[in-house]
C-alpha cells in the first residue's frame, strides 16, 4: 500500500501496472476516509468549534498514509471563514498562505493520480477530485483579494479567478460527459454488477466508494472491510448531523425565524438521528459528492462574483475570458446547498449574505417582478424564486440552525433576516439571547456585537448602540478608528436629540453634557487611530472616509470660529453610516420619521452656512427617507431640483458631468437613487429611464474610498433592470 503513497508524494514512481488491485482499493478507501475527515473538520467551524476541526486535521495528517492535499484545503477553508468573518490582516495572510499551499498540492496530486491512472470515482477521470480542490483553493484565495475593496487587489484576483474558471471548464466537460454516460444502459449494468450501498454480508462486502467490481479475495479482505465500513459510517453520521457531538437536529428544527419560535418545543424528543433533507444520499460515493457540490459552489460563486464586479475594474474581465451570469451562478449555489457538507454550508452563507447582508446586492426598493423562463426545466429554480427565495431561504437557514446549535454565526444570519424584514426589535432580542463572551470564534463574536450595534442605531437607540460599538475595541482588530468614530457619531445624535427637545426629563442638562463630551472626544480622536490597524497593508476604505470627514469638521471649525468642536459638524454623520449599511431599508415608519426630523430640523452654525456640499448630503438622504415613507414624488422633487443639477448638465443632447470631490460617495449614489425613483414612480414604464440613470451613475464612478462598495450596488441594479427591459 505504501508504494502507492510513496509514488504520490514523489518518493517513488512505479508504473500503474505495478500496483496490485488490493493496493489500489486500499488507496481509494483511504482517500475517501481522508476526505470524510476533512469534511467533518470543516463542519466543526460551522458549529463554532474551529479548534476541534483543526486538531482533527492535524491528528489525521499525523496518522494517515494519504497525501496532505485535502487536509491543506480544509485548513485553508477554516482559515478563510475566520478571515472573511473578521477581516483581520494576520488571519487573512495566514489563510492566503494555506490556500496557496493547497493550490500547489492539488496540482501535484492531480498529476500523479493521472499518471498512476488511479480512478477514485465511477463517473469521472483520475484526478478530478483534485481539480476541484485546486479550483476551490484558487477561488477562495481570489475572494480574499476582492474583499480588500482595493482596485489593485481586485485586478490581481481576476487573474486567479481565470485559473479557477479554466479548471472548472475542464471539470464541467467531464461532468457533462458523465451525465450522458449515466443514462446509458451499459453504465447501469456496470453499476448493478459492481457497486451498491455499503453491504457487509458475512465476510463479503461491496461499497459505492470503490468504482469497480472487487475480486473475490478483496471481498473477503477484513482490512478493506473495516476501512469501507469506517468511510460509510463517517458519511452516514455527517449526513445525519451526528458527527460533531450534537444531539439530533430534528428536535431543534423550527418553522419560523425569531426569538419567539425558540420557546416552542415538543414534549417528545427523539434520540434517533435522522436525515433532515430528502436530497441527502448515504449511498452516494464521498468523492462524487465532493466533486458535484464543489463544482456547483465554485462555479456558482465565480459567476456571481464576476457579475458583481464594478466597471472600475470591469475592463480587466477580458483577461478572465467571460462575463458571469448572476442568474446561473445563483442557481448553482442553490444546488450546492442541497448537499450536507461544507460546500452546502458556504453556499448558504453566501446566499444569506447576498439576500440579507448589509451591501444591497438586492435592493428591496428595486422590486421589479422577474420574467419567467418557460424553457427552464422544472427541476431548476425559476427567476422569481431566485429574486425572492422567501420561505426556501428561511427553511435552509432554520435547518442550519438545527444542525449547528452551538454557532452564533447562524444566529447572526437569522437576526439579519429579521432585520431585513423590518423586525428590528426581534433582531436585537435574538442577538441579546446569546452572551457574546461564550462564543469561541472571536470573528463571529465581533460580527454579533457589530450587528447588534448597527441594528440598535437603526432603531435610534443611539446610546446603547454606541456602548455596544465600543465593545468592538476589545474583541476586533479590524478598524478601531471606525468603531470609535461610529460610537462618537451616536453620542452626537444623542446630544442633538436633547438640543432639539426630542429627549428631556430628569438630569437632562447632565446627560446632554455627557453626550457632548463623549461625542467630541470620540469623533475627533478616531482620526488619530487611522493607520495603526491596516488591512492588507493598506488603510481601510472606511478609515479613509472618516479621515476625510474629520478634516471637513476641522475646516468648518476654522470658518465658523467656534470654540465648540461639535458646532463644526454639519449633516448628521451617523445617517451617512446608516446608508452605507443599508439601514434605511430596515427601518419602520417610526425610525424613518425620526431620521427625517434629524436631517431637516436640527440647526447649528455649520448647518446655517448652507454649504453646498453639506446641503447635497442632507438633500440626498432626505429624498431617500421620504421615498421610504411613501412620499415618493416629494423625495424625487428634492433630488431633481436640489441635488442632480449640481452633478450634471445636458448640452447638445449629451451629458456633461460636473466633477466634485468633497464627498465622492454622494455623486454616483444620487444617480443610483434617482433610478429607484423612476421605477417607483412609473413602474415598468420607467425602466428605460431608470437604466439611463444607472448608466450615469456608472459613468460618474471614480476610484475613491467606497468605489467598490457603491459600484457593486450600481452594477447589481443595472443588471437587474436590463433583465427586465
Swiss-Prot record:
Function (record text): Inclusion body (IB) resident protein that interacts strongly with lipid droplet (LD) proteins. Involved in LD-mediated IB clearing after protein folding stress, probably by enabling access to the IBs of an LD-stored soluble sterol derivative that acts as a chaperone in inclusion clearing.
This protein's encoding gene: IML2
InterPro entries: Iml2/TPR_39
PANTHER family the record matches: TETRATRICOPEPTIDE REPEAT PROTEIN 39 FAMILY MEMBER, TETRATRICOPEPTIDE REPEAT PROTEIN 39C
Protein family membership: Belongs to the IML2 family.
Organism (species): Kluyveromyces lactis (strain ATCC 8585 / CBS 2359 / DSM 70799 / NBRC 1267 / NRRL Y-1140 / WM37)
Protein name: Inclusion body clearance protein IML2
Disulfide bridge partners, by residue number: none
Tree of life domain: Eukaryota
Record's subunit section: Interacts with lipid droplet proteins.
Cellular compartment(s): Cytoplasm; Nucleus
Keywords recorded for this protein, A-Z: Cytoplasm, Nucleus, Phosphoprotein
Record keyword Phosphoprotein present: yes
The UniProt record lists the keyword Iron: no
GO CC annotations, alphabetized: cytosol; mitochondrial outer membrane; nucleus
One Pfam family matching this protein: Iml2-TPR_39
Amino acid at each position: 500500500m505504501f508504494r502507492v503513497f510513496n509514488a504520490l508524494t514523489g518518493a517513488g514512481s512505479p508504473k500503474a501496472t505495478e500496483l496490485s488491485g488490493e493496493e489500489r482499493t486500499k488507496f481509494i478507501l483511504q482517500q475517501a476516509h481522508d476526505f470524510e475527515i476533512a469534511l467533518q473538520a470543516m463542519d466543526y467551524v460551522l458549529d463554532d468549534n474551529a479548534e476541534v476541526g483543526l486538531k482533527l486535521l492535524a491528528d489525521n495528517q499525523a496518522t494517515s498514509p494519504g497525501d496532505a492535499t485535502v487536509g491543506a484545503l480544509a485548513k485553508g477553508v477554516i482559515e478563510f471563514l475566520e478571515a472573511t468573518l473578521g477581516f483581520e490582516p494576520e488571519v487573512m495572510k495566514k489563510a492566503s498562505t494555506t490556500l496557496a499551499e493547497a493550490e500547489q498540492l492539488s496540482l501535484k496530486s492531480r498529476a500523479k493520480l493521472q499518471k498512476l491512472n488511479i480512478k477514485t470515482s465511477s463517473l469521472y477521470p483520475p484526478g478530478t477530485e483534485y481539480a476541484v480542490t485546486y479550483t476551490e483553493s484558487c477561488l477562495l484565495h481570489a475572494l480574499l483579494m476582492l474583499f480588500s475593496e482595493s482596485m489593485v487587489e481586485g485586478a490581481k484576483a481576476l487573474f486567479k479567478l481565470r485559473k479557477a474558471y479554466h479548471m472548472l471548464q475542464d471539470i464541467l466537460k467531464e461532468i457533462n460527459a458523465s451525465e450522458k454516460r449515466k443514462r446509458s444502459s451499459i453504465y447501469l449494468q456496470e453499476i448493478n454488477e459492481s457497486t451498491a450501498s455499503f453491504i457487509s454480508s458475512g465476510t463479503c462486502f461491496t461499497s459505492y466508494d470503490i468504482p469497480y467490481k472487487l475480486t473475490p479475495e478483496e471481498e473477503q479482505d477484513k482490512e478493506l472491510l473495516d476501512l469501507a465500513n469506517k468511510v460509510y459510517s463517517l458519511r452516514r453520521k455527517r449526513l445525519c448531523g451526528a458527527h460533531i457531538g450534537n444531539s439530533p437536529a430534528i428536535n431543534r428544527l423550527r418553522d419560523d425565524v425569531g426569538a419567539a419560535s425558540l420557546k416552542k418545543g415538543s414534549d417528545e424528543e427523539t434520540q434517533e438521528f435522522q436525515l433532515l433533507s430528502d436530497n441527502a444520499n448515504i449511498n452516494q460515493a464521498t468523492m462524487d459528492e465532493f466533486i458535484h457540490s464543489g463544482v456547483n459552489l465554485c462555479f456558482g460563486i465565480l459567476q456571481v462574483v464576476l457579475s458583481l464586479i464594478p466597471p472600475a475594474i470591469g475592463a480587466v474581465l477580458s483577461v478572465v475570458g467571460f462575463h458571469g451570469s448572476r442568474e446561473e451562478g445563483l442557481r448553482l449555489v442553490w444546488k450546492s446547498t442541497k448537499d450536507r457538507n461544507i460546500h452546502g454550508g458556504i453556499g448558504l452563507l453566501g446566499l444569506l449574505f447576498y439576500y440579507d447582508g448589509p451591501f444591497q446586492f438586492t435592493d428591496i426598493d428595486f422590486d421589479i417582478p422577474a420574467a419567467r423562463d418557460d424553457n427552464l426545466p422544472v427541476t431548476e429554480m425559476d427567476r422569481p424564486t431566485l429574486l425572492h427565495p422567501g420561505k426556501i431561504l428561511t427553511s435552509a437557514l432554520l435547518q442550519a440552525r438545527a444542525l449547528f446549535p452551538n454557532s452564533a454565526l447562524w444566529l447572526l444570519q437569522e437576526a439579519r433576516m429579521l432585520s431585513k424584514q423590518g423586525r428590528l426589535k426581534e433582531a436585537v432580542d435574538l442577538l441579546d439571547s446569546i452572551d457574546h463572551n461564550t462564543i469561541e470564534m472571536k470573528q463571529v463574536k465581533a460580527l454579533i456585537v457589530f450587528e447588534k450595534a448597527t441594528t440598535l442605531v437603526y432603531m435610534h437607540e443611539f446610546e446603547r448602540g454606541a456602548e455596544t460599538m465600543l465593545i468592538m475595541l476589545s474583541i476586533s482588530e479590524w478598524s478601531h478608528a471606525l468603531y470609535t468614530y461610529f460610537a462618537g457619531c451616536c453620542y452626537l445624535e444623542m446630544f442633538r436629540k436633547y438640543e432639539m427637545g426630542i429627549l428631556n426629563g430628569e438630569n437632562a442638562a447632565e446627560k446632554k453634557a455627557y453626550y457632548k463630551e463623549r461625542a467630541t472626544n470620540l469623533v475627533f480622536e478616531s482620526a488619530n487611530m487611522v493607520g495603526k490597524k491596516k488591512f492588507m497593508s493598506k488603510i481601510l476604505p472606511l478609515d479613509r472616509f472618516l479621515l476625510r470627514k474629520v478634516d471637513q469638521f476641522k475646516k468648518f471649525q476654522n470658518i465658523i470660529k467656534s470654540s465648540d468642536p461639535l458646532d463644526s459638524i454639519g449633516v448628521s454623520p451617523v445617517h451617512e453610516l446608516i446608508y452605507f449599511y443599508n439601514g434605511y431599508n430596515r427601518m419602520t415608519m417610526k425610525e424613518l420619521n425620526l431620521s427625517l426630523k434629524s436631517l431637516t430640523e436640527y440647526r447649528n452654525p455649520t448647518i446655517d452656512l448652507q454649504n453646498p456640499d453639506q446641503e447635497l448630503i442632507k438633500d440626498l438622504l432626505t429624498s431617500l427617507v421620504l421615498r421610504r415613507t411613501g412620499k415618493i414624488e416629494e423625495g424625487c422633487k428634492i433630488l431633481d431640483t436640489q441635488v442632480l443639477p449640481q452633478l450634471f448638465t445636458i448640452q447638445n443632447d449629451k451629458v456633461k458631468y460636473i466633477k466634485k470631490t468633497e464627498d465622492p460617495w454622494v455623486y454616483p449614489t444620487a444617480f443610483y437613487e434617482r433610478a429607484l425613483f423612476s421605477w417607483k414612480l412609473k413602474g415598468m414604464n420607467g425602466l428605460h429611464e431608470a437604466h439611463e440613470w444607472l448608466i450615469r451613475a456608472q459613468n460618474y464612478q471614480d476610484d475613491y474610498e467606497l468605489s467598490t462598495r457603491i459600484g457593486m450596488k450600481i452594477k447589481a441594479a443595472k443588471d437587474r433592470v436590463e433583465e427586465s427591459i
